[in-house]
């Protein structure tokens, strides 16, 4: 049976928690798909780049610029940090 595990982006930012989780996943959940967030990372990156983030009822409104930032945060920063921790 394959398990799908979703973790939030804030967890990825905490190295101690991330490393503990990755150790646990490696030991216990071999047949798993790990899905990660990264909204907080996208927000931080947007702020650094001076790109205004619009939120409505806790949901990010994604225009062209914020979509580019989201791709950088999710596919770059968050993903690479998670993969490095799993290796």
Task: For every predicted segment, state its role.
Residues 1-87:
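Nucleotide/pyrophosphate-binding catalytic subdomain
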């Amino acid at each position: 049976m394959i398990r799908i595990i979703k973790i939030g982006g804030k967890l990825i930012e905490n190295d101690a928690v991330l490393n503990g989780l990755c150790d646990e996943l490696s030991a216990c959940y071999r047949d798993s798909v790990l899905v990660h967030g990264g909204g907080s990372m996208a927000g931080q990156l947007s702020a650094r780049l001076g790109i205004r983030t619009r939120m409505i009822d806790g949901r990010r409104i994604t225009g062209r610029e914020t979509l580019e930032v989201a791709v950088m945060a999710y596919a770059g920063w968050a993903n690479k940090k998670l993969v490095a921790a799993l290796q």
